[in-house]
Amino acid sequence: MQFELDNTDGKARRGRLKFDRGIVETPAFMPVGTYGTVKGMTPEELDETGAHICLGNTFHLMLRPGTEIIKQHGDLHDFMHWQKPILTDSGGFQVFSLGDLRKITEEGVTFRSPINGEKILLTPEKSMQVQRDLGSDIVMIFDECTPHPATESEARQSMELSLRWAKRSKAEHGDNPSALFGIIQGGMYEGLRDVSLKGLEDIGFDGYAIGGLSVGEPKEDMIRILDHTTDKIPAHKPRYLMGVGKPEDLVEGVRRGVDMFDCVMPTRNARNGHLFVTSGIVKIRNAAHKTDTSPLDDKCDCYTCKNYSRSYLHHLDKCNEILGARLNTIHNLRYYQRVMQGLRDAIAEQKLDEFVADFYAQKDMPVPAL
């Protein structure tokens, strides 16, 4: 992987990630394909939304179908028929999500499979091996996602364990040609974030992710840690904000110098009838849309907006038709990609402030201070 920076506007950056499998323009939003599919989308439809990289989930794919079956097809790209880049997370966050069902030791995390109850040990080495088998273009280190809330002592202990696991991840990654990203932890404590980043830089990674945010903390805490941390990541390396978020969060992340984002929000919300539009959010199952023959968003160029009315989408939602979830997903993913394209163009033209002002004005929201 090569990372090139083309333009900056304030702290915001425009560039590209170059892989053997293609180029990803940054800032980039990466749709989440947990089980080797972005829910409801064919790879061709995903490509048409403007996505050029997606996520796979190490934890879930390791449990089902398992890497042996995936390797029989070649790798995850061949298995899911997506020949563009794939980033895989390490499984750390999913294990964190298991709560009391898991036990953390120096060696790794022991948990019971949510599928069959089998006892499984996931270590940094195992995570790297699984991600190598998946053929990931960007591999994430295995870390412990610090829970929120955590005392400074708890956050330090968690962060230090993650640093030791980062060393083991790097050693196991070895000669794998895929990019390897470190993950900055440290909870809501700026000093711990600094120690984490310094430790990761000493080990050396191809990119750096900001982890442990969007885990239930107040928005102002997320912004505070983002403000503190993003600038300190080496400028020549890509910066990835994990698991974030709403369209406004993407805009605020880009304003602070973030290059990459992922989140289940556009796809999950689509399946629940919550649709992102230029003016805000449309809840398509509301009765107000029953007779509305206008498109979902007249500024959107997606397949859904070009061909269907709000009334039809409301009807599909009321009938629980699968097509409704699919059309909603196409729209939400395209909306996110249009926001990212708008940000990239604005940075290139040195018009980011104008873009941001317009973005918030159309939603009737004030522009947050930087």
Swiss-Prot record:
One of the GO biological process terms: tRNA-guanine transglycosylation
Cofactor: Zn(2+)
Catalytic activity: 7-aminomethyl-7-carbaguanine + guanosine(34) in tRNA = 7-aminomethyl-7-carbaguanosine(34) in tRNA + guanine
Region (RNA binding): 243-249, 267-271
Positions of substrate binding: D89, S90, G91, G92, F93, D143, Q185, G212
Gene Ontology MF terms: metal ion binding; tRNA-guanosine(34) queuine transglycosylase activity
Assembly mode: Homodimer. Within each dimer, one monomer is responsible for RNA recognition and catalysis, while the other monomer binds to the replacement base PreQ1.
Name of the protein in its database record: Queuine tRNA-ribosyltransferase
Gene: tgt
